[in-house]
Amino acid sequence: MSGQQRGSVILVPEHLAGALTKLMSDFITGQDVTLSGGNIAVKIRDAINQTPGGGDVAILSSLFALWNALPTSGRQSSRDDLIPAAVQALTTAHNLCLGVIPGETSHKDTPESLLRAIVTGLQKLWVDSCGCPECLQCLKGLKAIKPGLYEIPRIIPHTKQCSPVNLLNMLVHKLVALRGHVQLAYDARVLTPDFHEIPDLDDSDAVFARTLLAALFHLNMFFILKDYITQDSMSLKQALSGHWMSATGNPLPAAPETLRDYLEAFRNSDNHFYLPTTGPLNTFKFPEELLGRVVVIDSSLCAASHVQDVITRGVGAGVPRPQFLALPPAPSRKPQQTCSQLTSRGNESSRRNLGQPGGTSPAVPPVCPIVSLTASGAKQNRGGMGSLHLAKPEETSPAVSPVCPIASPAASRSKQHCGVTGSSQAAPSSSSVAPVASLSGDLEEEEEGSRESPSLPSSKKGADEFEAWLEAQDANFEDVQREFSGLRVIGDEDEDGSEDGEFSDLDLSDSDHEGDEGGGAVGGGRSLHSLYSLSVI
């Protein structure tokens, strides 16, 4: 192409005009979402095969052609359609702040100062209402909010999610990461938090919090739309200024005609083509003029009254606030039952331990209500409780043998007898006390009407048979000692009486009775024979 034509001159050879024209057309129409004012200069350099730092005049002419075509392009027209929505968002946020924080808001406030007033009000509210670590963490999120295309961090404590925050962050992600277009069907209700999207506050504080948050979300919507509308023109002007500085060493002139005349001077017959443009040259004040159309307070577009009506009616996004019923009173805890109350004979056991009414408490050693008399003897000796010791009879209180209501075979047949049944003292009728066995006195006498114990011989057979019975019990007691000693002796008996098995090192002796009369079993342990012999002697 040769000759002077209407439009912007591009100092690029004609054989590259096809690829470059398509690239510039995709940017102007907005068909290629990957193109923006910030990266278009790099795309042009790649299209004309210029190395970085070279071809500044060719790139400068291409950027100047895009600059002149931008105001009337379809790309910018779609952004201009969002100017009323941005104005409405700013006006709504401003009027909401005038209603709840009039002392910190004035008609001369900039959007940035309005943002600081809202953040300060929310920070004070979170601290005064709760002040927990989660609230303090949200204070940092509020402080991190910046005007522009930035996602909103966590700013509302004690809530899992907030629909307006999700909407705004999704919009930012679409514009920044996906470089998509905004087709906004603006509705003030979508930027008003619901009652369950704020902490549990008093009614007045809840209205205050929802109003401030609605103002904050409207203001963030304004910042997003403002940057989206003006970003291309500002980025393109910045790139144009940089390449002009690189080509001439001077700052960008005030009039675009200076730049046009400079480029026309480099035109000759084979190194240029023209990009057709309509209208006059685009002034370099275009971004500022565009911003002046966005940052406007227009009361005719204000939606603050609608937002306040939504909040004061107790609804958010059309959802009414439910009325929660009062919780029923918590049931009183029952007192914890004692061990004696949980057993089947708890009442008798507790009265037996307290002693008979009006008398002296009998000498009763510590009793385990579960283990048997014979088998538990080894366990008690091994656990350090000592041998069973029967007190000598006194005139005021009979000797009481350990009572075992559950374990021994005798207990399954006789529910009230565990030991030797001898002459016993009758219990008063006012207290149900288990029969007490006494080994004092003559063993040949037996209380009339008492049941015969299958585990012990009858007292009528005399002391000789009772001594023989005790010797048999001693043998059984040695087996019990071996069973609970940890190592069971297995082997044949040698001539010297020892067995060829291994014996346990566990000492079953009772140090508390090593000095008692009558000696003890071999190894320090006391046998049942010597134990019961105390009462026979």
Curated annotation (Swiss-Prot):
<keyword id="KW-0946">Virion</keyword>
<dbReference type="GO" id="GO:0019033">
    <property type="term" value="C:viral tegument"/>
</dbReference>
<feature type="region of interest" description="Disordered">
    <location>
        <begin position="325"/>
        <end position="474"/>
    </location>
</feature>
<dbReference type="InterPro" id="IPR008550">
    <property type="entry name" value="Herpesvirus_BRRF2-like"/>
</dbReference>
<feature type="region of interest" description="Disordered">
    <location>
        <begin position="486"/>
        <end position="537"/>
    </location>
</feature>
<feature type="compositionally biased region" description="Acidic residues">
    <location>
        <begin position="492"/>
        <end position="517"/>
    </location>
</feature>
<protein>
    <recommendedName>
        <fullName>Tegument protein BRRF2</fullName>
    </recommendedName>
</protein>
<keyword id="KW-0920">Virion tegument</keyword>
<comment type="similarity">
    <text>Belongs to the lymphocryptovirus BRRF2 family.</text>
</comment>
<feature type="compositionally biased region" description="Polar residues">
    <location>
        <begin position="334"/>
        <end position="347"/>
    </location>
</feature>
<feature type="compositionally biased region" description="Low complexity">
    <location>
        <begin position="423"/>
        <end position="441"/>
    </location>
</feature>
<dbReference type="Pfam" id="PF05734">
    <property type="entry name" value="DUF832"/>
</dbReference>
